[in-house]
Amino acid sequence: METVVIVAIGVLATIFLASFAALVVVCRQRYCRTKNLLTNYNNKPTVDLIGAMETQSEPSDLELDDVVITNPHIEAILEDEDWIEDASGLVSHCIAILKICHTLTEKLVAMTMGSGAKMKSPSSLSDIIIVAKRISPRVDDVVRSMYPPLDPKLLDARTTALLLSVSHLVLVTKNACHLTGGMDWIDQSLSAAEDHLAVLREAALATEPERPMTGADNFLQEQSAI
């Protein structure tokens, strides 16, 4: 049964990699003056990214290495902090959140592989698979929201949904694999993502129209001035 969850989380990691690649292709074409880092990459449409996850719902005996597709350019992309010209400065925070979620996913795969014999029950494995399948559409939603024109409210809502889904995956994986000690790095990663999310939320709030002052507000303001 542990093979099922390894395959499921492995496919999730594939979705992250493919989504990053799709995002870079679009943004390079629209913004960047430098040559495309993904010249040799076979770009899949977003619909295919979601569909690929759905086709993996049945158990399989494939090994993790047979599922995870590694793009030779992805590491260079993730390390490049200036690969996109973004006047708002919000896209870099979205990418940082995607990076954190991608790293968490890879490490969850490793933990699952090392904890196969400690799985509680088939229902625990089923929980992990269900939660993992919910994350891939969230990733695609974030990528879509990063296309211009940028909407800070949409960025905030979709990155929040993604982070909540990843946090849920962390919880069910910890529970299913009996993971307790030495998990500080997970909390630190989620905290770092929350910091980036706070910037997006602040930008979203800044776009809110100012609320007209009511009579009660005027009264309180006058009282405070006395």
Swiss-Prot record:
Which residues lie toward the Cytoplasmic compartment? 1-3
- Coarsely, its chief localization is endoplasmic reticulum
Give membrane topology per the record: Single-pass type II membrane protein
- Cellular component aspect of the GO annotation: endoplasmic reticulum; endoplasmic reticulum membrane; extracellular region; plasma membrane
Transmembrane keyword on record: yes
Where does it live in the cell?
A: Endoplasmic reticulum membrane; Cell membrane; Secreted; Secreted, Extracellular exosome
Q: Does the keyword Secreted belong to this entry? A: yes
Membrane-spanning residues? 4-24
Q: Which GO terms describe its biological process?
A: negative regulation of myelination; negative regulation of oligodendrocyte differentiation; negative regulation of protein localization to nucleus; negative regulation of protein processing
Q: Which residues lie on this side of the membrane: Extracellular?
A: 25-226
Q: Which family does it belong to?
A: Belongs to the TMEM98 family.
Protein known as: Transmembrane protein 98
Native source organism of the sequence: Xenopus laevis (African clawed frog)
